[in-house]
Amino acid sequence: MEDSVLYSFYFWTYMQPNYYRVIKKATSFSGLEMISHAYGQIAGVEVVGFYLWLITEANIQAFNSEIRTPISRLQNAFNPFEIKKNQVSEWIYKTISKLESLGLVRTFFSPKRSEITFCIIDPLDWKEFKQNKQLKEKLVEAMGKVEYDRNCLAFDQIDNLQFDNALEISANFEVNFTANQSDVWFSFNFEELHKELVKNKLLISLDEKAKTLINGYFEKYKLSLQQITDCIINSSTQENELDFQKLEMMFFQIVKNDTAPILETVSNNKDFFYKNEILDESTKKAITDCHVNFNSEKYLFLLYGKIDESQLQLVRQLRSDYQLLDKVINLVLDFSFWKNNGMWREKYILKIAQSIKINNSQNSYEKTLNNFIRALTLNKKHSLNNIKPVEKTISFTEYFEFIK
């Protein structure tokens, strides 16, 4: 044993301080999740229980910082564990030692004050934990590869998405709790992909970040199952993990090399708004189906080809602040797309949303569409009468005020 380990064992076996204290920084909820699902799998339930007890004790002592806590409180705290009195010191030593080895506790002893101090260290987050080779190997050993992969799915959060190349396709409220709304799901068959990966002896977990990237390229560029499988195989590491950036680069290269056809993925047509009365019914139906059947994050991605976090935030705002249904949001996005020559105009979209709310048409696709058509007709009439250009001087709120 190293000198520090020998001293620690000797201390817990033969020397008892009269007092102890516990100090810590704030421990986040996600940190406690890591203790339960990662560290606890390695060290065991008793060690986790002791760590959580230390956190509680630190909170109590923080309110009584002037009162010294006798060591007997620490010893008596573990009666529920049915530890024999003469074995308490050994049990505490072993438990603390495990926490120290995991980097969760640092221990200090002051002979002058006859006081021992436990300094609680926040656990690593999941990304840092996986990068620690020793911890990762111990966790896989403790829970098995399958359960480890499940943990990966649980901890790799959606907010880590690179939104410039990914879309959120989460179902919104209307999808499941409003009548006549279609279900939203990944259109790509990930079960078939899993079978192909198994055939190639590749056991790899795809998190939501990877799935959204795959699904986005599948829908927009119609990459085949074989193309996607090959890209994943070539983007995997020796540890059976996915190199996301490499996968993204390979998808991009396929499209750049024109080895996959770039297909129109949403039906849209400028005349749906500008010449609706003469547009053929089949085209109208195809456009309307896209508005009605896609959730807005997905529609936004398919319309613009890529989306960022600010655009996704705007979609959420249209739902929460303006109470627009997804089919109405999609209609607004499509209208703005044509009015602004394919450019993204956030303030313009918000003006439209405000007008829709004022006219109480948040839930009416038909009423909103008719308002768009009538507004464009009004704009055209004003232009023909040599009135100041309406598009530059009159907001869409004012458009709708004219056509009530």
UniProtKB/Swiss-Prot annotation:
<protein>
    <recommendedName>
        <fullName>Uncharacterized protein MG349</fullName>
    </recommendedName>
</protein>
